[in-house]
Amino acid sequence: MITTHNLGFPRIGAKRELKFAQEDYWKGRISQEELLNVGAELRQRHWRNQSQLDLTPVGDFSFYDQVLDMSFTLGVIPERVSRLQGGELDNYFRVARGRSAQDSDCHCVHAGEMTKWFDTNYHYIVPEFTADTAFSLNPSRLLAEIAEAKQTGATIKPVIIGPVTYLWLGKSKDSSNKLDLLERLLPVYAALLDVLANQGVEWVQIDEPILVTELDAEWKYALNLAYHTLKSSKAKLLLATYFGQLQDNLQLACELPVGGLHVDAINGRAEIGKLIDWLPSHKVLSLGVVNGRNIWKTDLNQTLDWLQPVYDKLQSRLWLAPSCSLLHSPVDLDSEEKMDAEIKSWLAFALQKLDEVKILATALSEGRNTVADALKENQDCVSSRKHSPRVHNPAVKEAVEAITAEMGDRRSDYQTRAARQAQRLQLPAFPTTTIGSFPQTADIRNARRRYRQGELQDNEYRTLMQQEIERCVREQENLGLDVLVHGEAERNDMVEYFGEQLDGYVFSQFGWVQSYGSRCVKPPIIFGDISRPQAMTVEWIKYAQSLTDRPMKGMLTGPVTILNWSFVRDDQPRALTCYQLALAIRAEVQDLERAGVRIIQIDEAALREGLPLRRAQWREYLQWAVSSFRIAANGVADETQIHTHMCYSEFNDIIEAIAGMDADVITIETSRSDMELLDAFDNFKYPNEIGPGVYDIHSPNIPSETHIVQLMRKAAERIPAHRLWVNPDCGLKTRNWEEVRPALQNMVNAAKQLRADVVAA
């Protein structure tokens, strides 16, 4: 008998019910009780969705972020929040976003830092530690969910983040060693496991994904210490790893005193033989055999071919699951009513992935003949995709093969370009700009919806969008910004917008996944070779530039970010797909330049998140990623200024690669880290211009003029003032005009003060 289970289920709801409830609560439209009821309804639905599994995860639901949930379970709440009055949920949202529902300005606090969850597009709230951090157990949330789940009749498996990964994910605020806290933390984990065991829980999934990263001796010792301390727990521990291979941590993972080990068999299939040999015979081995991070059907027959000898050896010690939490997958393919039927047949979302796990387990336990129809249907779909002429475009392949090194080079060095751009643009010191998008009002979203549904003709839609663009331009002129943007009213998403206009893409209606908090994204699906049939942005940017004498930025998403924020075909190397995207963006850049656009921004917000988790593999990734950007950006004259933007990035370890992109201006997200990201520039003299973000757009809080000046002065300690720009952290799409106007006015006023300081000096 094979045990089937799941590491986690998407929490947002098939139609984003959680998102809408969160935002209604924050705006005071619904009560806390109503928000909690939505959460309870979603949990019940999701447990029913997983009822075919032998073990159902509990504790994977969150009102914002699972790492923040763990922080509250362990009593790790920043003092700036814990001193405020209010209930636990209010303080929870204050850490997450700087304020809770209907907080007045006096209750606003600095939101917790947010960064990427390993190499995914999910973001977590970074735990904050000091040498004096104390831990205290608060299991109420988890216990309440266990009580709910028991009522469904499911056999439950609580899910928690392991103690060593939790410390690894956090940040020391006083330069103390995070691992010094481990001995203080472990008794709280032991108490939590005892509480869970007393609830009748047999298995607890304890996630230690750092085991797929490069660990030094100190962190390996910490893992040994942690699990030898926790081994007396009455509950059995399933140690879960995901997102990669164990490699040099394989022996350690096998030897830790736990009841079982889950591994990512999508990325780590080559290690399974060694795992079978090394894992003690009293432990279970859970294999993640269905890809939890992509949307392609599993080739079930091929998977069974290699799984059969594994099952023959392990028998009931073999467990099957997706490779990682299905948090990274859309919920239900059956919701897709408008997708091309052939392409839809190639896909599997979260619910379908659980079906695949069950089919595999049944085929192994009871024989393939018991699921012959399901296996035949799966084989037909896999074969259809493999042989479809829609996937392959010979002209695109020829264009990629014709790429030369010269296509990635600018005509002159940065100093020459900078002089020519300064002469052409005539910008002041500390030039102000924004990152691209402006608030997406209800009117904008309604117009796009009506256009998609055929209620608006092309000319009617164009008129409405031009009105929004003009409004955005006038707002920026009134605020006094130096370099303007058109506001992106016509764009639903910075990746999906481009994908809709590229051949080789298909789109879902409800393929939403959580990015952070209430922010959901609907990644487009790359199913075939990529090409650009026609210009994608030129009409809108030309119109915006016609409204003003100030420079108007052309706004594009870069090839690496489009790749990393899409569901990508898995039948060819990612690098090859990225080069196809680079050629499409290059053609758009050249069209914008021909249209008279003087500044072109090519966002590479997701450059860093594509890095492999192991540093040994970075060089190969950065080589083709930087090369792709340069191919996209560098077919222009010296006088054309190329910008790029990056989000949530630590730069110390890839600063040379970023410099190698050779963008004239780079804007980065730094406000939540209080400019700490600029530490990268202490030992590396970045040669070009840079705009460190001074306005945290992920929080509704409005930065003061004084605060912005202080941040920019910190930046000027590292970057020469004549190479600094003043800008928000990221696009303003998710904010409203009532927040944006005063924030940008303070930013413009701060820039004026900085210029006056330079003149006075």
Swiss-Prot record:
Binds 1 zinc ion per subunit. It catalyses: 5-methyltetrahydropteroyltri-L-glutamate + L-homocysteine = tetrahydropteroyltri-L-glutamate + L-methionine. It holds the Pfam family Meth_synt_1. The keyword Cell wall biogenesis/degradation does not apply. One of its GO terms (molecular function) is zinc ion binding. Its EC number is 2.1.1.14. Zn(2+) binds at H645, C647, E669, C730. The active site is at H698 (proton donor). L-methionine binds at I435, G436, S437, E488, D603. 5-methyltetrahydropteroyltri-L-glutamate binds at R16, E17, L18, K19, K116, R519, C520, W565, E609. This is 5-methyltetrahydropteroyltriglutamate--homocysteine methyltransferase. It comes from Hahella chejuensis (strain KCTC 2396).
